[in-house]
A protein has these predicted regions:
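Compositionally biased, intrinsically disordered or flexible polar/acidic segments
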Residues: 1-168, 174-177, 336, 345
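Alpha-helical cap/lid subdomain in secreted, periplasmic
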Residues: 207-352, 356-375
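Conserved SGNH/GDSL esterase-like catalytic core that processes O-acyl groups on lipids
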Residues: 151-157, 162-255
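Short, structured coil segments at secondary-structure junctions
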Residues: 99-101, 184-186, 259, 298
Length: 375
């Protein structure tokens, strides 16, 4: 079946492998390199293999093995409901899927030999391309269905480097917002606007809040986590906890509410700095209390991620907690050949744990309906 350039409202159906295509599906093989005229394809076909087990069922009999490559579909910006089918009649599989700038959707999804699983999730697209990156020990993709949806709730994130989508070149660096999609079902998508190095002030001054407010819709959410860079001495970022910090945070709250969206304040995650008794030192000073006071005054839910990460780090202990952050020895990670000692930024496993804490906070704050959309 020949595909055409897609428009708003289109439904995409792809059948991967060597066998004949299922009815109404576009066949994708190992040679299906991204073609701008078609608007879909793999980024690197040298990392894709196609197999046909010649069993019953056109979607089950064959598949592609995408080894650390991505499948791209050109689409209008917006939210999409995506359903992925994976499995193999002959052997066990393990597949990880990320979208866009490394947002985790499926983590080490496993199937036994002869088992086939369908998983659905929501993806927020900006930039005109839906990108699904595949990895894993034995990844598979049998079929893929994509449909635009106006019913999906969007969780917008405003924050700093501890929240942001870290670039692939920095792997295993990751922000907790980058891992949050893994905690949500197909009814909610994450739009991560967090940016490294920003404070509550500089984020606004650069027009980043305004960019969110142009997109946010009634009943969407705006999660707001700043504090790390508000402490910095430069005038472009510096705020004072009792005054300017609260002032700028209130602009996020007011902007969301004016558009019918729901603001949520999040206290800044702690740095990994222990005292001699194995307890976390609060390096954020009065900024944490300022968030709580503002939340109470404005009747805005507060997720105390500072307290949750404190408990997490202390439970891990001073030495073991290094594995949550980008502590590495020379040669451990190709992107950091000289090693790294970083007590602020997470590596992927740490970001996943903190995203789970954020999800726990959503449930504890009874953020309805978002709490119903947690995995």
């Amino acid at each position: 079946m020949m595909a055409r350039k897609r428009t708003v409202g289109s439904v995409f159906k792809f059948d991967f492998g060597l066998g004949p295509a299922e009815n109404s599906y576009v066949k994708i093989g190992a040679e299906s390199s991204y073609d701008v005229s078609l608007g879909y394809g793999f980024t690197d076909v040298n990392q894709v293999y196609a197999i046909d087990r010649e069993e019953a069922g056109r979607l089950r009999r064959d598949f592609c093995i995408p080894l650390n490559t991505a499948f791209i579909v050109d689409v209008p910006d917006g939210n999409y409901h995506v359903t992925l089918m994976v499995g193999d009649t002959l052997t066990a599989t393990e597949t990880t899927v990320k979208s866009g700038e490394g947002r985790l959707l499926l983590h080490r999804l496993q199937t036994a030999a002869g088992q086939f699983i369908k998983r659905s999730f929501a993806v927020h697209v900006s930039g005109g391309q839906l990108i699904l990156a595949f990895s894993g020990i034995a990844p598979r993709v049998n079929a893929l269905e994509i449909a635009a949806s106006s019913q999906i709730v969007t969780v917008f994130l405003a924050g700093d480097s501890t929240v942001t989508d870290q670039e692939a070149e920095g792997y295993p660096y990751a922000g907790w917002g980058q891992m949050l999609p893994h905690c949500l079902n197909a009814s909610a998508a994450v739009a991560n606007h967090a940016k490294s190095g920003r404070s509550s002030k500089s984020f606004i001054d650069e027009g980043r809040l305004e960019a969110i407010l142009q997109l946010i819709r009634p009943n969407d959410y705006l999660f707001i986590q700043f504090g790390h860079n508000d402490q910095k001495p430069d005038l472009e970022r510096r705020t004072e906890p009792a005054t300017t910090y609260k002032h700028f945070l209130k602009l996020y709250i007011d902007g969301a509410r004016e558009r019918g969206a729901l603001p949520v304040l999040v206290t800044a995650v702690h740095r990994r700095i222990f005292d001699e008794n194995g307890l976390i030192i609060n390096t954020h000073g009065e900024y944490l209390q300022a968030v709580k006071e503002l939340g109470e005054a404005e009747e805005v839910p507060v997720i105390d991620l500072a307290d949750k990460t404190r408990k997490l780090y202390e439970a891990y202990g001073a030495e073991r907690s290094k594995r949550l952050f980008l502590w590495s020895v020379p040669g451990e990670f190709p992107n950091h050949p000289s090693g790294s000692v970083d007590n602020t930024h997470f590596q992927e496993r740490g970001a996943i744990e903190v995203a789970k804490l954020a999800a726990e906070g959503i449930r504890q704050a009874q953020l309805n309906p978002l709490m119903l959309f947690l995995n």
